[in-house]
């Protein structure tokens, strides 16, 4: 009897995502700081399965076809799980949130839920498919989200306004900039004693069109200085409508002036470069920009919602959208960065995993005492 009573008193929350990488990459460092909850994971089986099992209290498999915009089988599978588990849920990404809302429809046992929208993504892109999907969802989106989600966490106020205008969401909203970084894990770049002979430029990103991959290729071909080397790190995102085509991937691989690295260990390898570019056309809060600023790279980024929030940082230049020649000019004129200690102090105070985890934990506690 005592054991059963104890089990009922355990506060449990399930981190839910349609991609195992999301629960591993930026959420793994949050778990150890959240002491008031038993954190479980639910996601598809993937290459990070073993790491996820070592981090979370328990792991449930959720098979989903990422190539489908709406996987009906995955929705039904999630619905069955929701019927049989007593847990709060924290959904990560808008796509996962939509699937959760559909699975939760008309269920009697309402599991309280938080949604972190870390990017408006495909749904709010300009493609004809996205416009059609928005048109189809518009009549139902308000009911779906207000019925299933208690709290939505955004990463900047601009995108929050866009989403609320579309969804008419009236429950609680919070703005928590960034997903947090575990700053102690990063190798810091040493300040050079002299101007380096070779200057290394890198773009780290999923290989998506809206991440500016093709713009980056244009820059590579426009810069003519022999002492500048260009690198691209990241992988394709199968199932994402913005995933670059096989043909364009071949162009990337065949570009003689570009070194394609695939996946890298950002925490230990980012310090090997001098300049970090962020060329996304939209971004809620650029994690790679935050990481680059912490490590000590000079950063050049498009001026969008997810980068402008970091305008007070040193060694950061923001450029208006589509001004590729200004990127070229800035790269060619780059000399050396100034002291980076201010950036590290700001990040350690406001943007670490520990800081974000404490904000999450506060939200979870408020859910527990709400009706």
State where each predicted segment sits.
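Glycosyltransferase donor-sugar binding loop
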Residues: 42-48, 181, 204, 229-244
